[in-house]
Amino acid sequence: MATDGASCEPDFSRSPEDAAGATAEAAKKEFDVDTLSKSELLMLLSVMEGELEARDLVIEALRARRKEVFIQERYGRFNLNDPFLALQRDYEAGAGDKEKKPVCTNPLSILEAVMAHCRKMQERMSTQLAAAESRQKKLEMEKLQLQALEQEHKKLASRLEEERGKNKHVVLMLVKECKQLSSKVIEEAQKLEEVMAKLEEEKKKTSALEEELSAEKRRSTEMEAQMEKQLSEFDTEREQLRAKLHREEAHTTDLKEEIDKMKKMIEQLKRGNDNKPSLSLPRKTKDRRLVSISVGTEGPMTRSVACQTDPVIESSDHVKKLPLTMPVKPSTGSPLVSANAKGNVCTNAALVRPGIDRQASHGDLIGSSLPTVPPPSANRIEENGPSTGSTADLTSSTPPLPNNAAPPTVQTPGVAPQSYSQASPMHSLHSPCANASLHPGLNPRIQAARFRFQGNANDPDQNGNTTQSPPSRDVSPTSRENLVAKQLARNTVTQALSRFTSPQAGAPPRPGVSPTGDVGTYPPVGRTSLKTPGVARVDRGNPPPIPPKKPGLSQTPSPPHPQLKVIMDSSRASNAGAKVDNKTVASPPSSLPQGNRVINEENLPKSSSPQLPPKPSIDLTVAPAGCAVSALATSQVGAWPAETPGLNQPACSESSLVIPTTIAFSSSINPVSASSCRAGASDSLLVTASGWSPSLTPLLMSGGPAPLAGRPTLLQQAAAQGNVTLLSMLLNEEGLDINYSCEDGHSALYSAAKNGHTDCVRLLLNAEAQVDAADKNGFTPLCAAAAQGHFKCVQLLIAYDANINHAADGGQTPLYLACKNGNKECIKLLLEAGSDRSIKTRDGWTPVHAAVDTGNVDSLKLLMYHRAPAHGSSLHKEEPESSIFDLDRQGEESPEGTFKPVVPADLINQADREGWTAAHIAASKGFKNCLEILCRHGGLEPERRDKCSRTAHDVATDDCKHLLENLNALKIPLRISVGEIQPGNYGSDDFECENTICALNIRKQTSWDDFSKAVTQALTNHFQAISSDGWWSLEDMKFNNTTDSSIGLGASSVRSITLGNVPWSAGQSFTQSPWDFMRKNKAEQITVLLSGPQEGCLSSVTYTSMIPLQMLQNYLRLVEQYHNVIFHGPEGSLQDYIAHQLALCMKHRQMAAGFSCEIVRAEVDAGFSKEQLVDLFISSACLIPVKQSPVKKKIIIILENLERSSLSELLGDFLAPLENRCPESPCTFQKGNGTAECYYFHENCFLMGTIAKACLQGSDLLVQQHFRWVQLRWDGEPMQGLLQRFLRRKVVNKFRGQVPSPCDPVCKTVDWALAVWRQLNSCLARLGTPEALLGPKYFLSCPVIPGHAQATVKWMSKLWNAVIAPRVQDAILSRASVKRQPGLGQTIAKKHPSQGQQAVVKAALSILLNKAVLHGCPLPRAELDQHTADFKGGSFPLSLVSSYNSCSKKKGESGAWRKVSTSPRKKSSRFSSPTWNKPDLSEEGIKNKTISQLNCNRNASLSKQKSFENDLSLTLSLDQRFSLGSDDEADLVKELQSMCSSKSESDISKIADSRDDLRRFDSPGNNPAFSATVNNPRMPVSQKEVSPLSSHQTTECSNSQSKTELGVSRVKSFLPVPRSKVTPCSQNTKRSSSSSNTRQIEINNNSKEEIWNLRKNEQVEKPNK
C-alpha cells in the first residue's frame, strides 16, 4: 500500500507557480518509500510540511485574486476599454448558458481541482505515514531479535570452537591408538603364524604318534591274542591236572577209608561185643563222612560255597566286605587246630583241600580270633576223629538240614556292627571250607548236619552240661534229659542221612538279618566253650513275653515228622547265588513259583505220625547275645521289619533281611521272627541245636502235659512254626481258645497265615477260627498272607469269606499290602475276588501308588488291566503266569489297542497328602516302565500339580522326562514322493514312487517354526545319508544344513508339502499348533513332493534314479546345446530312462516358454531301415521341404536301442544335414514310397539316441564325430555310485527312515550285492569280454528283507542264471571263436562249440561264480553250500583250469597284483599263445595296445610306425597259427588260471584292469628279449591326463602296491588321436605300468575312444601295406 501511495505522489518541492505542471509530472516520478532510511523519511516529512504551508499561502493568494476577478467580471463587464472583453461578453450573453463555454480557463475551477487533489494526496500521505510508523516499530523489534540472535550465535560459535578443539584431541588420540592397535595386530599375526607353524609341527608329531600308537595297538592286540591263546592252553592244562589231582585224592581217600575200616574192625574184634553198640554209630557216620570227603574239590562244591558265602549283608558295614576278600589258606587247617578249635573253619586240612581259591568264606576272615579259643574236652576228638564238619559250639550251631545246601544259620549278617571280634566266630559257623571237601553231589547242609549230630554230643556248654544248645528259656536241664534229647536227635539224623548217599543239589538258605539288633548288652556271639555266666536263665514255666509286633516267635519245638524223603524231591535248583537287590538274597528254587513258598507244604504233614522217633528240627537257638538271627529266622517264611509296626514293609524290604528259605520239610522248621535280635529277646530262643527242648521230649513221647506255658501260647507257636501234628493235637483238646491273641494281637491263624503254613491255616479255619481277627495294628490274617505273598493261604482265607477290603489302622488293605510287596499271585486272587482298588490309606495312597512305588510292573499291569470274573470270586487254579504273560504281550503289541484298562481316570490321577499322583512317584524314582503303563491310560493327567505346584515332568528323571515329553507326541511318517512313475517306463520298474524317510515327533508344544525346521532338517539328513559313503547313522553324521547333499538334493528341491491332504509350505503357520492341526485333520503322513520334469526340474529324477543332479543338468545342457546326443554304456545303464526324463524336462520347459513341444519315440531293431527313419523325421516335422517355411514347434526324437542296427547305414546320410541345419544346405532323401525330395533339418529339432553297448566298432565309428556322446561307464559316475545309493535308499525306506548299523545283516547283504556287481564287471573286463558288462539296472531289484539273507541269495541265483551266465557264455564263446580271416574285426560265436570251448566257458563261469559272486556272501558256509547248486556252472572243478597249461609266474611279481600275462614276452616268430582281443576289435593293432601302454619320452613318431608294423606282423603270425588249427582257448585258459591263482579271493576286484589285461594273456617268461630288464621301475612317464581315482576304486586297491605309481595313467581324449603314436616301451616300463593302481580305472574309462583311434589309424595304414 505504501508503494501505491508513493507512486502517485507529486513533487511539491517546486514553487507554487509550477503546481499545475507538478501534477502532470508527479505521475511520472515515483518514490519508493520502503527504501528510505529514517533520516530521509524525516527530511521528507519536513518537506511535505513545508509544501503544505506553501499551499495554504497559494490558496490565500488565489482567493484574493479571485475576489478581484469576480468584481471585475461582475462590474466591469461592460467596460469598453478592452474590445476583447466586449466580444467575450457578447459571446457569453448571446447564446444559452448551457451551450456556451468560457473563452479562457476559469481559475477557480483550476483551484478547486488543485485543492481536491491536495486533499487526496494528504489522505494518502497520512496512510503512508501510519504504515511507515508501523514498519518502523516492526523494524525496531526485529533489530532487537537480531541482536539477541547475534549474541547467541557468538556463544554457539565459541562453543563450536571448544568442541572442535576437543574433537581434534580425540582424533589425535584415536589415531595414536589405531597405530598402536595396528602394531599389535601385526605382532599378533606374527605370533599366530608362529603358533600355526607350531600347531602344524604338533599335528605332524601327533599324526606320527598316532601311527605309532596304532602300530602299538596292533602289536598289543597281537600280544593279547597270543596271551589269550597261552592262557587257554594253561587253563586246559590246569583243568587236566586238577582232574588228575582229584582222582588221586579220591583214590587216597578211599585207601585211607579202607585203612580206617580195617583198623576199626580189628579194634572191634579186640574189644568184643560190649563196646560194639557204642562204636557202631560213629563208625557208620564217619564212614559216610569220609566217603563224602573223597571228591570234595569237584565242581558242585562251588555251588555250595556260593550259597554260604554270598549272602547280602546290610546291617553291618564291616561284614559286607567279608565274603570275597580273603582266600582260603592252607595254613588254617592244621589237624591240631582243626580238632580243637570249634570256631575254626576248615578243621580237617589233612583230608580236605583248603577250600576253593576263588571263594572266600566268612570263617577265613577270622583268623585273629582263632588262637583265643580254648581247647574242648578230649572226648570230642575221640568220638568224631578229625571231624571236618565240627563247628564251634555256638548257640546257633549247625542244625540238621539234610536237603539244603548249607547250614541254615547263615545269619552271619545278623551280627550287629558292634565289634569285629563278636562277628568273627559267628562267621566261622558257615565257612564253606567245612563243606568244601564233602561229596560234590551230597548237599553240604546234610554233611554239616551229619557231623554236627555225631560230633557234639559230649560238648560241654557254658554250664558244664554236655548239650549242644545254650541255656534256653525253658531249660533247667539235667544230664539225663539232655542225653535223651541228643540221643533221639542223633538217631533221627542217622536214619535220615542214611537215605542221602546219592548226590543232592540243594537250594541255599536265604540269609536274613535284623538291622535293629541291639547288641551292646550281650556277651560275644561265638561261644566256643567260653563261660558266659552273665546269661540269664529262666525257669521252664515262665517264658519271657514275645516282643511286641513280632508274631510267630517260635517258643516250642515242633513234633517229629517222618517225611524226610521229600527233602530229596526234584533235586533242587542249583541257583544258589545271592541276589543283592534288597528283595531276595538267595534265589528261590527253580521248581517253585515263589521264593518263599514251602515245598510240598500241603502233602508233607498229612503223613506225619508221632510214633516215629523225633527228628531234629531246624530250631537253631542263638547265643543270649541275640546278635545273630537263628535258624528259625532263616526258615521263617517272612518277618516284619523292626522299625515300623504292622505290615507296612515287605518281608524282603531293606529293613528286614530275614529272608525265607526254600524249606523242604515244612513241619520240622520253626520260623522265628526277626525280633529275636531285639533287646530282651536273649532268653526267648527255645530250642537246642538238635531241634528239641529236653523238657518237651516226655510230652511228645508219652502224651503227658507239657511243662511249658499255657496251651494258647503253645497253639500259637505250633501255628507259627507250621507244626501240623502238634497243632492238630492241640485243636483236639477241649476248652482251648483257638482265637487267643498274644499281647500284639496275633492269633494262631494270623501267625500261620503270616508264615505261609497252608495246612495249619486250613486246620484252624476248619476249627472255626475267626477269619478276620485283627492284631492291635488292625492287620488280619489275610493282610499278613497277602503281604508275605503266601497266595495259597490267601486263597484259603478268601474261600472262608475273609474280608478282602479290610483296612488296617493305617488304611492298608490286603490288596495294598500285596501291591506294596509285589506279590502278583496274591494281587490276582484279590482282584478276582472283587477287591476294591480305590481304597486309600491314611497317607492318601491307593494300591496303584504302592505298586508304582516299588516299581513292580506286573503288579501295576494287574491293577490296571485285570478284570474280575463275571461269576464273582474265582478260586479256580490257573497258571500263575499266564495272565501276566498275555498282558505283557498285549501291552506291547497294542499299547492303546484292544486291551483297555479297567481302572477309572480318577484312580490313576488320585493324589496323596502331598499332592503326588502315581505318575509323580514313577517319574521321580525313574521307573520308566511303570510310567509307560500309566501313560497308556487315556485319562492320565500328566500336567496335574502337587502341593508345591510341581508336575510329574518337574520331578522326573531324564529318561522319564523324555517319556513324558513324548507322551502325547504324534509320530507321523515323513515321506518323499516323486509323483507318478509310469509302469514299465524305460527301465523304471524298480523305482518307487514314495519312500519313508523318518517319523516326526510332533509334541503339544511344537511350534510351526520348529516343525518347519524339523522337516527341513529331516530332508537334509536323509539326502546326505543316502549319498554318503558308509553306513552311518544320522546321529553319527555331522550334517550341514546349508549345503546340498553330494547328489545335489536339498530343501530347495521340494515342490510342495502336504500335511495329510492339506497343502503346506515351509515357514507357513496356521492358527492351530501343529499338534492340534494334525489331530484335527487326522493327518497320517507328511508327503514331500520333489520338483520334477513337469516343473522343468530334475530333482525327482535324481531322487528316483540316484544320478547326481549336476550330471543330469549337464546332460540336459548338452542336449540343448548340441541338439544331437547319444547315450551309450553297458546294457542296463538306464540310457533309455535318462533320455526320456531329459526329453520330458525339455518339453515342459519349452511349453512354459510358450512353445509347443512333442516327444517322438522310435525303437530301433535289426529290421529298422533308413527309409523308415526318413518317414519318421518327415512325419514329426524334423525334416522340412526346402520350399516350406520352418515351423515354430519343438520336436524331440528319441531313437532307442541303436546298437541293434548299423549306425553308419542308418544315420550315414543324415550326418551332414544334422550338422548344417539350414535351407541353404538341403539334402535329397528318398521316402518309403519311393519318391525323393530335398529336405533340411530345422533348428528346433533335438535328436537323442541310446546304445546299450560298451564301445563302438568298425564303420560305426564314422558316426562318432557328428554326435555328442555321453558315456555311462560302469566304473565311473554316475553309474559307479548309483547302485550303492539306490540300495542304501531302499534300506532306509525298509527301516522306516533309520540307517541300520554297518554290522546289520541287511547292510552286509546289500554290500555283498554291490560287491558282486563291481567284481563281476571287473572280472569280465579282465577277461576281455566288454559286451558282457552289466549296468546297475539288473541289481536295482535286489530284495531288502531284514533277517532273510537267503532271499537275496536266491534272487542272485535267478539273476545269474537268467542274465549273467548267458551273457558271459556268449561273450566267452564269441571271443574264443574269432573268424580265421584277418582284418574283418567281427566275432561270431560258433553254433556248435568244441569241447575245449565248452570247457573254457564252464571254467569261466565257475571262476566268476566263486571269485565274484559267492565270495563275500554273508550267509554261513553251510547255508551257502546249499544255495551253490542253484547257480548255473557252479559245479565245474577248478583243478582242471589250473592244470590246463603249466604257467609259472616270475619272481618279480608281487603277491597283491597277480600280473599274469600283462606284458609282451614273446617275439612274433615264437608266438606260442595267441593274444585275444575284445570281440569289437579287429585282430590288428592289439599287440600295440599292450606294448605301448604308456607315453615314454622317446621318438614318438618313429615308434608309432614301428609299432604298427610290429602289430601287423604279430597279428599275421597269429592268424597263420589259427589256420594251422591251434588251440584257440589257450589264451583264455591262461587268464582264467591267473584269476584262479590269486591267493586272496578279493584280489579279483583289485586286479588291475588296464588295457593290456584285457587283451594280453601270454605266459610270462617266454620272451628273453624283453625279460632282460624287469626291475627298473623308474622309467620316465609322461601323462597327458590322469584319471582320478574314485573313492571305491581307491579302497579296492591293494596296500602292497607301489605308492610311486599312483599317478600313472593313459591318455584320455574324445578326439580321434591315434594310439599308435605311443612308443613301445621296454619291459621295465611295461611292468611298472601294469602294477599301477590306475590300471583298474583305465580299462573302461578309455577303452572306447582308444579303440576308435586304433581303427581309424588302421584304416589309414592298411592301403599302404
Curated annotation (Swiss-Prot):
Residue spans of biased composition, Low complexity class: 1626-1640
Subcellular location as annotated: Cytoplasm, Cell cortex; Cell projection, Dendritic spine
Principal location: cytoplasm
One Pfam family it belongs to: Ank_2
One cellular-component annotation, GO: glutamatergic synapse
Coiled-coil ranges (or none): 120-276
InterPro entries attached to this UniProt entry: Ankyrin_rpt, Ankyrin_rpt-contain_sf, Cortactin-Actin_Reg, Cortactin-binding_p2_N
Entries under PROSITE patterns matching the protein: ANK_REP_REGION (PS50297), ANK_REPEAT (PS50088)
Comp. bias (Basic and acidic residues): 1544-1562
Protein keywords: ANK repeat, Cell projection, Coiled coil, Cytoplasm, Methylation, Phosphoprotein, Repeat, Synapse
Region spans: Disordered: 1-23, 201-235, 360-441, 455-480, 499-617, 1447-1484, 1544-1648
Polar residues bias (residue ranges): 385-395, 584-594, 1564-1576, 1584-1604
Modified residues annotated as Asymmetric dimethylarginine in this record: 499
Biological process annotations from GO: regulation of synapse organization
Domain of life: Eukaryota
Keyword Ribosomal protein on entry: no
Keyword Heme among UniProt keywords: no
ANK repeat start and end residues: 710-740, 744-773, 777-806, 810-839, 843-872, 914-944
Residue positions where Phosphoserine is found in the record: 1526
Subunit structure: Interacts with CTTN/cortactin SH3 domain. Interacts with STRN, STRN4/zinedin and MOB4/phocein; this interactions mediate the association with the STRIPAK core complex and may regulate dendritic spine distribution of the STRIPAK complex in hippocampal neurons. Activation of glutamate receptors weakens the interaction with STRN and STRN4.
Biological role: Regulates the dendritic spine distribution of CTTN/cortactin in hippocampal neurons, and thus controls dendritic spinogenesis and dendritic spine maintenance. Associates with the striatin-interacting phosphatase and kinase (STRIPAK) core complex to regulate dendritic spine distribution of the STRIPAK complex in hippocampal neurons.
Annotated protein name in UniProt: Cortactin-binding protein 2
Species, as recorded: Equus caballus
Gene name as annotated: CTTNBP2
